[in-house]
Protein backbone atom coordinates (compact mmCIF):
# COMPACT_ATOMS: atom_id res chain seq x y z
CA UNK A 1 0.00 0.00 0.00
CA UNK A 2 1.51 3.28 -1.13
CA UNK A 3 0.55 6.71 0.18
CA UNK A 4 1.73 6.54 3.79
CA UNK A 5 4.27 9.37 3.47
CA UNK A 6 3.92 13.12 3.02
CA UNK A 7 6.40 15.96 2.55
CA UNK A 8 9.44 16.83 0.43
CA UNK A 9 12.09 17.95 2.93
CA UNK A 10 10.14 17.53 6.16
CA UNK A 11 8.92 14.00 5.50
CA UNK A 12 6.45 12.12 7.68
CA UNK A 13 5.64 8.42 7.31
CA UNK A 14 3.16 6.50 9.47
CA UNK A 15 2.37 2.83 9.99
CA UNK A 16 -0.01 0.69 12.02
CA UNK A 17 -3.68 -0.20 12.25
CA UNK A 18 -6.51 0.56 14.65
CA UNK A 19 -6.40 -2.85 16.35
CA UNK A 20 -2.77 -3.76 15.69
CA UNK A 21 -0.08 -3.95 18.34
CA UNK A 22 1.05 -0.36 17.87
CA UNK A 23 1.14 2.72 15.68
CA UNK A 24 4.40 4.26 14.57
CA UNK A 25 5.92 7.09 12.62
CA UNK A 26 9.15 8.47 11.24
CA UNK A 27 9.96 12.17 10.75
CA UNK A 28 12.88 12.66 8.38
CA UNK A 29 14.34 16.07 7.62
CA UNK A 30 13.98 17.80 10.96
CA UNK A 31 17.13 19.92 11.40
CA UNK A 32 19.65 18.96 14.06
CA UNK A 33 19.77 20.90 17.32
CA UNK A 34 16.05 21.25 18.08
CA UNK A 35 15.33 20.63 21.75
CA UNK A 36 12.88 17.75 21.80
CA UNK A 37 11.46 15.30 24.33
CA UNK A 38 8.52 12.95 24.55
CA UNK A 39 6.75 15.59 26.64
CA UNK A 40 6.77 17.92 23.62
CA UNK A 41 4.76 15.35 21.68
CA UNK A 42 2.57 14.21 24.56
CA UNK A 43 0.85 17.55 25.06
CA UNK A 44 -0.91 17.48 21.69
CA UNK A 45 -1.52 13.74 21.94
CA UNK A 46 -3.39 14.34 25.18
CA UNK A 47 -5.60 16.89 23.42
CA UNK A 48 -6.54 14.27 20.81
CA UNK A 49 -6.75 11.30 23.19
CA UNK A 50 -10.08 9.40 23.22
CA UNK A 51 -12.35 8.82 26.19
CA UNK A 52 -12.06 12.26 27.78
CA UNK A 53 -15.79 13.03 27.68
CA UNK A 54 -19.04 11.27 26.85
CA UNK A 55 -18.97 13.05 23.50
CA UNK A 56 -15.97 11.12 22.15
CA UNK A 57 -15.28 7.41 21.73
CA UNK A 58 -15.01 5.61 25.06
CA UNK A 59 -12.01 3.60 23.86
CA UNK A 60 -9.42 4.12 26.60
CA UNK A 61 -5.97 4.72 25.18
CA UNK A 62 -3.18 6.46 27.09
CA UNK A 63 -1.44 7.29 23.81
CA UNK A 64 1.94 7.44 25.51
CA UNK A 65 4.57 8.11 22.87
CA UNK A 66 8.06 6.62 22.93
CA UNK A 67 10.83 8.23 20.87
CA UNK A 68 13.05 5.50 19.46
CA UNK A 69 15.64 7.42 17.45
CA UNK A 70 16.80 10.79 16.19
CA UNK A 71 17.13 12.47 19.59
CA UNK A 72 20.27 12.46 21.75
CA UNK A 73 20.81 14.32 24.99
CA UNK A 74 17.55 16.20 24.49
CA UNK A 75 18.21 17.49 20.96
CA UNK A 76 17.47 16.25 17.47
CA UNK A 77 20.47 14.79 15.68
CA UNK A 78 19.31 15.43 12.12
CA UNK A 79 18.68 11.72 11.57
CA UNK A 80 15.19 10.19 11.22
CA UNK A 81 13.08 10.57 14.36
CA UNK A 82 11.24 7.32 15.02
CA UNK A 83 8.44 7.02 17.57
CA UNK A 84 5.76 4.55 18.56
CA UNK A 85 2.41 4.46 20.41
CA UNK A 86 1.10 1.14 21.69
CA UNK A 87 -2.56 0.19 21.26
CA UNK A 88 -3.95 -0.89 24.64
CA UNK A 89 -7.76 -1.04 24.47
CA UNK A 90 -8.74 -2.90 21.31
CA UNK A 91 -12.09 -4.77 21.35
CA UNK A 92 -11.96 -6.58 18.03
CA UNK A 93 -14.93 -8.80 18.94
CA UNK A 94 -17.19 -5.76 18.53
CA UNK A 95 -16.63 -6.01 14.77
CA UNK A 96 -17.11 -9.76 14.23
CA UNK A 97 -20.67 -9.29 13.00
CA UNK A 98 -19.57 -7.01 10.15
CA UNK A 99 -16.44 -8.84 9.01
CA UNK A 100 -18.13 -9.75 5.71
CA UNK A 101 -20.34 -6.64 5.47
CA UNK A 102 -19.56 -3.20 4.07
CA UNK A 103 -20.48 -0.24 6.25
CA UNK A 104 -22.28 2.41 4.17
CA UNK A 105 -20.15 5.55 3.89
CA UNK A 106 -17.01 3.74 5.10
CA UNK A 107 -13.78 2.71 3.36
CA UNK A 108 -14.66 -0.98 3.82
CA UNK A 109 -15.80 -1.45 0.22
CA UNK A 110 -13.03 0.52 -1.48
CA UNK A 111 -10.23 -1.14 0.53
CA UNK A 112 -11.66 -4.58 -0.20
CA UNK A 113 -12.12 -3.78 -3.89
CA UNK A 114 -8.59 -2.39 -4.30
CA UNK A 115 -6.57 -4.81 -2.17
CA UNK A 116 -8.70 -7.94 -2.15
CA UNK A 117 -8.93 -7.88 1.65
CA UNK A 118 -9.60 -5.50 4.50
CA UNK A 119 -8.97 -5.29 8.22
CA UNK A 120 -12.52 -5.08 9.54
CA UNK A 121 -11.34 -4.57 13.15
CA UNK A 122 -12.07 -0.91 13.65
CA UNK A 123 -11.31 -0.11 10.03
CA UNK A 124 -7.63 -1.08 10.17
CA UNK A 125 -5.48 1.43 8.33
CA UNK A 126 -8.49 3.58 7.36
CA UNK A 127 -9.32 4.26 11.01
CA UNK A 128 -8.78 7.70 12.52
CA UNK A 129 -6.71 5.88 15.14
CA UNK A 130 -3.79 6.32 12.71
CA UNK A 131 -3.96 10.08 13.19
CA UNK A 132 -2.43 9.81 16.67
CA UNK A 133 0.93 9.46 14.92
CA UNK A 134 0.23 12.50 12.75
CA UNK A 135 -0.42 14.54 15.88
CA UNK A 136 2.92 13.44 17.33
CA UNK A 137 4.72 14.39 14.10
CA UNK A 138 2.82 17.66 13.98
CA UNK A 139 4.03 18.51 17.47
CA UNK A 140 7.61 18.31 16.18
CA UNK A 141 6.71 20.56 13.25
CA UNK A 142 4.99 23.04 15.58
CA UNK A 143 8.02 23.31 17.82
CA UNK A 144 10.36 23.74 14.84
CA UNK A 145 8.20 26.53 13.38
CA UNK A 146 7.75 28.24 16.73
CA UNK A 147 11.46 28.28 17.55
CA UNK A 148 12.66 29.14 14.05
CA UNK A 149 10.12 31.80 13.04
CA UNK A 150 7.71 32.36 15.93
CA UNK A 151 4.89 30.68 13.98
CA UNK A 152 1.79 29.57 15.90
CA UNK A 153 -0.74 27.06 14.57
CA UNK A 154 -4.08 26.74 16.35
CA UNK A 155 -7.49 25.37 15.50
CA UNK A 156 -11.08 25.42 16.70
CA UNK A 157 -14.42 23.74 16.10
CA UNK A 158 -16.74 26.40 14.67
CA UNK A 159 -19.94 24.51 13.98
CA UNK A 160 -21.75 21.22 14.46
CA UNK A 161 -24.99 20.35 12.73
CA UNK A 162 -27.29 23.39 13.12
CA UNK A 163 -25.11 25.06 15.78
CA UNK A 164 -22.74 27.58 14.17
CA UNK A 165 -20.48 30.09 15.94
CA UNK A 166 -20.47 33.64 14.63
CA UNK A 167 -16.97 35.15 14.14
CA UNK A 168 -17.89 38.05 16.43
CA UNK A 169 -18.15 35.59 19.35
CA UNK A 170 -14.66 34.14 18.92
CA UNK A 171 -12.18 34.07 21.78
CA UNK A 172 -9.11 31.91 21.22
CA UNK A 173 -8.54 31.72 24.97
CA UNK A 174 -11.74 29.65 25.30
CA UNK A 175 -10.60 26.86 22.95
CA UNK A 176 -8.57 24.95 25.55
CA UNK A 177 -11.15 25.49 28.29
CA UNK A 178 -13.79 23.10 26.94
CA UNK A 179 -13.86 19.60 25.45
CA UNK A 180 -15.31 20.84 22.14
CA UNK A 181 -12.34 23.11 21.30
CA UNK A 182 -14.94 25.84 20.87
CA UNK A 183 -13.80 29.48 20.70
CA UNK A 184 -17.13 30.58 22.18
CA UNK A 185 -17.97 29.68 25.77
CA UNK A 186 -21.64 30.38 25.12
CA UNK A 187 -21.85 27.67 22.47
CA UNK A 188 -20.65 24.83 24.70
CA UNK A 189 -24.06 24.23 26.25
CA UNK A 190 -25.67 24.23 22.80
CA UNK A 191 -23.13 21.70 21.52
CA UNK A 192 -23.68 19.50 24.58
CA UNK A 193 -27.46 19.48 24.31
CA UNK A 194 -27.46 18.83 20.59
CA UNK A 195 -24.78 16.13 20.63
CA UNK A 196 -26.36 14.36 23.59
CA UNK A 197 -29.49 13.81 21.50
CA UNK A 198 -27.40 12.56 18.58
CA UNK A 199 -25.46 10.19 20.84
CA UNK A 200 -28.54 8.72 22.54
CA UNK A 201 -30.12 8.09 19.14
CA UNK A 202 -27.07 6.06 18.09
CA UNK A 203 -26.47 8.57 15.32
CA UNK A 204 -23.59 10.88 14.36
CA UNK A 205 -23.13 14.39 12.98
CA UNK A 206 -20.62 16.38 10.93
CA UNK A 207 -18.79 19.56 11.88
CA UNK A 208 -16.95 22.66 10.67
CA UNK A 209 -13.46 23.60 11.83
CA UNK A 210 -10.84 26.30 11.28
CA UNK A 211 -7.07 26.38 11.59
CA UNK A 212 -5.11 29.64 11.72
CA UNK A 213 -1.34 29.91 11.25
CA UNK A 214 0.16 33.23 12.35
CA UNK A 215 3.70 34.52 11.99
CA UNK A 216 4.30 32.63 8.74
CA UNK A 217 7.08 34.39 6.81
CA UNK A 218 6.50 35.84 3.36
CA UNK A 219 7.55 33.52 0.55
CA UNK A 220 6.51 29.98 1.49
CA UNK A 221 5.14 28.05 -1.49
CA UNK A 222 6.47 26.75 -4.81
CA UNK A 223 4.45 27.62 -7.93
CA UNK A 224 2.91 26.17 -9.86
CA UNK A 225 2.14 22.62 -8.80
CA UNK A 226 3.53 22.92 -5.27
CA UNK A 227 1.52 25.97 -4.27
CA UNK A 228 1.26 26.37 -0.52
CA UNK A 229 -2.54 26.45 -0.59
CA UNK A 230 -2.65 23.32 -2.76
CA UNK A 231 -0.40 21.41 -0.38
CA UNK A 232 -2.35 22.61 2.66
CA UNK A 233 -5.60 21.49 1.05
CA UNK A 234 -4.08 18.09 0.27
CA UNK A 235 -2.81 17.71 3.83
CA UNK A 236 -6.15 18.59 5.42
CA UNK A 237 -8.11 16.49 2.91
CA UNK A 238 -5.99 13.49 3.92
CA UNK A 239 -7.66 13.51 7.35
CA UNK A 240 -10.38 10.90 7.77
CA UNK A 241 -13.91 12.21 7.14
CA UNK A 242 -12.86 15.58 5.67
CA UNK A 243 -15.04 16.34 2.64
CA UNK A 244 -14.36 20.00 1.93
CA UNK A 245 -11.53 22.52 2.40
CA UNK A 246 -11.31 26.25 1.71
CA UNK A 247 -8.59 28.87 2.12
CA UNK A 248 -9.49 32.40 3.17
CA UNK A 249 -12.88 33.44 1.80
CA UNK A 250 -13.02 30.13 -0.05
CA UNK A 251 -16.35 29.30 -1.66
CA UNK A 252 -17.74 32.73 -0.78
CA UNK A 253 -15.34 34.11 -3.40
CA UNK A 254 -17.80 32.99 -6.05
CA UNK A 255 -20.32 35.56 -4.78
CA UNK A 256 -17.84 38.46 -4.58
CA UNK A 257 -16.88 41.22 -7.02
CA UNK A 258 -13.34 42.37 -7.67
CA UNK A 259 -13.97 45.53 -5.67
CA UNK A 260 -15.22 43.56 -2.69
CA UNK A 261 -12.59 40.84 -2.81
CA UNK A 262 -9.36 42.76 -3.42
CA UNK A 263 -6.94 42.63 -0.51
CA UNK A 264 -5.76 46.22 -0.82
CA UNK A 265 -2.32 47.19 0.48
CA UNK A 266 -0.78 50.28 2.00
CA UNK A 267 2.79 51.12 3.07
CA UNK A 268 4.15 49.11 5.97
CA UNK A 269 7.39 49.05 7.93
CA UNK A 270 9.38 48.74 4.69
CA UNK A 271 8.97 47.96 0.99
CA UNK A 272 9.09 44.21 1.58
CA UNK A 273 6.43 44.28 4.29
CA UNK A 274 3.34 46.22 3.17
CA UNK A 275 0.22 46.26 5.29
CA UNK A 276 -2.84 44.44 3.96
CA UNK A 277 -6.22 46.05 4.60
CA UNK A 278 -8.09 42.73 4.48
CA UNK A 279 -7.29 39.03 4.15
CA UNK A 280 -9.80 37.45 1.79
CA UNK A 281 -6.94 35.42 0.30
CA UNK A 282 -6.32 33.70 3.62
CA UNK A 283 -2.64 34.60 3.73
CA UNK A 284 -1.71 33.11 0.35
CA UNK A 285 -1.46 34.78 -3.08
CA UNK A 286 -0.24 32.96 -6.17
CA UNK A 287 0.44 29.93 -4.02
CA UNK A 288 2.93 31.91 -1.89
CA UNK A 289 2.46 33.10 1.70
CA UNK A 290 1.91 36.85 2.14
CA UNK A 291 2.87 37.10 5.81
CA UNK A 292 -0.76 37.49 6.83
CA UNK A 293 -2.48 34.83 8.94
CA UNK A 294 -3.18 31.68 6.94
CA UNK A 295 -6.82 30.71 7.42
CA UNK A 296 -8.11 27.25 6.53
CA UNK A 297 -11.68 26.06 6.97
CA UNK A 298 -12.92 22.54 6.44
CA UNK A 299 -15.89 20.25 6.94
CA UNK A 300 -15.98 16.69 8.26
CA UNK A 301 -18.77 14.27 7.51
CA UNK A 302 -20.66 12.28 10.17
CA UNK A 303 -18.89 9.06 11.09
CA UNK A 304 -20.30 6.07 9.23
CA UNK A 305 -20.08 3.81 12.30
CA UNK A 306 -23.49 4.26 13.94
CA UNK A 307 -26.05 2.11 15.77
CA UNK A 308 -28.87 2.94 13.36
CA UNK A 309 -29.58 -0.03 11.01
CA UNK A 310 -28.68 0.66 7.37
CA UNK A 311 -28.92 -1.28 4.12
CA UNK A 312 -25.77 -2.53 2.42
CA UNK A 313 -24.22 -5.56 0.71
CA UNK A 314 -21.70 -8.16 1.82
CA UNK A 315 -18.54 -9.54 0.17
CA UNK A 316 -20.74 -11.98 -1.77
CA UNK A 317 -22.85 -9.19 -3.24
CA UNK A 318 -25.89 -10.09 -1.18
CA UNK A 319 -28.15 -7.57 0.53
CA UNK A 320 -27.65 -7.17 4.27
CA UNK A 321 -28.33 -4.87 7.19
CA UNK A 322 -25.46 -3.18 9.03
CA UNK A 323 -25.36 -2.03 12.65
CA UNK A 324 -21.94 -0.98 13.99
CA UNK A 325 -21.57 -1.81 17.68
CA UNK A 326 -18.03 -0.61 18.39
CA UNK A 327 -17.08 2.50 20.37
CA UNK A 328 -17.17 5.54 18.11
CA UNK A 329 -17.21 9.33 18.19
CA UNK A 330 -20.70 10.80 17.67
CA UNK A 331 -18.85 13.77 16.13
CA UNK A 332 -15.34 13.18 14.78
CA UNK A 333 -14.92 16.93 14.36
CA UNK A 334 -14.07 17.39 18.05
CA UNK A 335 -10.86 15.40 18.00
CA UNK A 336 -10.07 16.57 14.46
CA UNK A 337 -8.87 19.94 15.81
CA UNK A 338 -5.39 18.80 16.97
CA UNK A 339 -5.16 16.52 13.93
CA UNK A 340 -5.73 19.42 11.54
CA UNK A 341 -3.26 21.59 13.43
CA UNK A 342 -0.69 18.82 12.95
CA UNK A 343 -1.27 18.51 9.20
CA UNK A 344 -1.03 22.28 8.72
CA UNK A 345 2.15 22.47 10.82
CA UNK A 346 3.78 19.60 8.93
CA UNK A 347 3.03 21.27 5.60
CA UNK A 348 4.33 24.64 6.76
CA UNK A 349 7.50 23.04 8.18
CA UNK A 350 8.12 21.33 4.85
CA UNK A 351 7.67 24.57 2.89
CA UNK A 352 9.74 26.49 5.42
CA UNK A 353 12.69 24.17 4.84
CA UNK A 354 12.26 24.52 1.07
CA UNK A 355 12.02 28.31 1.38
CA UNK A 356 15.13 28.43 3.52
CA UNK A 357 17.02 26.43 0.89
CA UNK A 358 15.94 28.67 -2.01
CA UNK A 359 16.06 32.20 -0.57
CA UNK A 360 17.63 34.71 -2.97
CA UNK A 361 21.11 36.09 -2.26
Curated annotation (Swiss-Prot):
InterPro entries: Chorismate_synth, Chorismate_synth_AroC_sf, Chorismate_synthase_CS. Its EC number is 4.2.3.5. SUPFAM superfamilies: Chorismate synthase, AroC. It is an enzyme of class 4 (lyase). Pfam families: Chorismate_synt (PF01264). NADP(+) binds at residues 48, 54. GO terms for cellular component: cytosol. GO terms for molecular function: chorismate synthase activity; FMN binding. It catalyses: 5-O-(1-carboxyvinyl)-3-phosphoshikimate = chorismate + phosphate. Reduced FMN (FMNH(2)). Pathway: Metabolic intermediate biosynthesis; chorismate biosynthesis; chorismate from D-erythrose 4-phosphate and phosphoenolpyruvate: step 7/7. It comes from the Bacteria. GO terms for biological process: amino acid biosynthetic process; aromatic amino acid family biosynthetic process; chorismate biosynthetic process. This reaction introduces a second double bond into the aromatic ring system. PANTHER family: CHORISMATE SYNTHASE. Homotetramer. Belongs to the chorismate synthase family. This is Chorismate synthase. The lineage of its organism: Bacteria, Pseudomonadati, Pseudomonadota, Alphaproteobacteria, Magnetococcales. The gene is aroC.
